[in-house]
Amino acid sequence: MRWISRPGWPGHLLALAAGALTPLALAPFDYWPLAILSIALLYLGLRGLPARAALWRGWWYGFGAFGAGTSWIYVSIHDYGAASVPLASFLMLGFTAGVAFFFALPAWLWARCLRRDNAPLGDALAFAALWLALELFRSWFLTGFPWLYAGYSQLQGPLAGLVPVGGVWLSSFVIALSAALLVNLPRLFPHGASLLLALVLLLGPWAAGLYLKGHAWTHSAGEPLKVVAIQGNIAQELKWDPTQVRAQLDLYRDLSLPQQDVDLIVWPETAVPILKDMASGYLGAMGQVAADKKAALITGVPVRERLADGNSRYFNGITVVGEGAGTYLKQKLVPFGEYVPLQDLLRGLIAFFDLPMSDFARGPADQALLKAKGYEIAPYICYEVVYPEFAAALAAQSQVLLTVSNDTWFGTSIGPLQHLQMAQMRALESGRWMIRATNNGVTGLIDPYGRIVKQIPQFQQGILRGEVIPMQGLTPYLQYRVWPLAGLAGVLLLWALLGRRLRPQERRLFG
């Protein structure tokens, strides 16, 4: 098995296969032990490699992970971006090759500056710290691509109890640490004290996760809210067709009018497919309908802001009418779907760079939460719910979470179910109920433990009725966020860096 840790194609191909295991640990497959196996194979494959070979080993791992785990991008480009099979394949491969460097560069850094082959315990801790730093970096760099985090595999796994303590980040850290420790255990057998400490570090977090699973960090803030969520199941090719606007508005109206004994009626992202100011009459009428029911209606709608120079800016928004108030403008935009980077160069080249409603502006950072029935509701539009820290900042101020989305872009791929899993993780992190309304699924109600209580399956038109309980109190993660864990990672990485520079007799103190 030494070939695994040597430069060359056999090791690279194993890294590719190990990376491809990543999505199998996540939704919709949920074989969570594969997350540990995947990372363990990468860690083993990096052992002893020179920096240049480690860079390519990490790149192949990333190519496997993103190639298999974000294959839904091909569906968006080909099926809905009107790109040919060769062009869609080329763009997909180009994207995958680029984001694979998220793993390549840390692998190079690991081999060049941090790896400590003669200190297996310290080496495992430093590797887990670097893995956490990588996931944090991915959530921020170039607006972020926080997809395929290892920690999502634990949504209902043994580590779920740790998620309210340190978020998905803590789960990822423990998985990476466990993977490295399992690889290094045979090397620790001759060293009793180090072996004992390694076993504590290996088993302790999993035991703590099981012990805390189901612990109530938050409590009720009032009576349950009766919720109706509408899933319109509008085909994407009809979504922005001007001749279909009236039919869509009538559909959501007709599905909502019969609803009685309700507090919140929720429609999906851009359920109103025309600008808010153009739909003022319709929204006013629906607001009166909701008020007559003593309810609030919350819907996605594009918003126009007229500027002093005569131009306009457009936003992806959510607005509340009836017994509620507020309009929220989306802050985290989807590249190419809602805005086009370098648009002066790319617009007009292919249809994928000219998708409908792909010229949105970013909403301001300090926006008030939505208000309905006397409660603060944290809004997330589509992609925003996948950002743990962004979501936590809003959740801490709220009693209920709300996410609206249109996952039609991803067809029958695994993308919508991955997206749902990340939304579930936000509920678990915050200890709050979440309402999720989507155009074509999965619409559902999620409890504070990340479990789906009710749902409408994908690709069906439907009406979901249920209750959510407004919650108050802060989980440790909402209170302290990722900073304690990031600080620990920084200390461990500094420890590893210093350990590489010490003389052999001093290095034992760091091992």
Swiss-Prot record:
- UniProt pathway: Protein modification; lipoprotein biosynthesis (N-acyl transfer)
Q: Does the keyword Metal-binding apply?
A: no
Q: TM segments?
A: 7-25, 58-78, 90-110, 125-145, 163-183, 192-212, 478-498
Q: Can you supply one Gene Ontology CC term for this chain's record?
A: plasma membrane
Q: Which CDD domains match?
A: ALP_N-acyl_transferase
- Which GO-annotated molecular functions does the record name? N-acyltransferase activity
Q: Where is the CN hydrolase domain?
A: 230-470
- Return the PANTHER family for the record: APOLIPOPROTEIN N-ACYLTRANSFERASE (PTHR38686:SF1)
Name the NCBIfam families for this protein.
Answer: lnt
The record's function comment reads: Catalyzes the phospholipid dependent N-acylation of the N-terminal cysteine of apolipoprotein, the last step in lipoprotein maturation.
For this entry, the protein name equals Apolipoprotein N-acyltransferase
Organism of derivation:
Pseudomonas paraeruginosa (strain DSM 24068 / PA7)
Q: Output the lineage of the source organism.
A: Bacteria, Pseudomonadati, Pseudomonadota, Gammaproteobacteria, Pseudomonadales
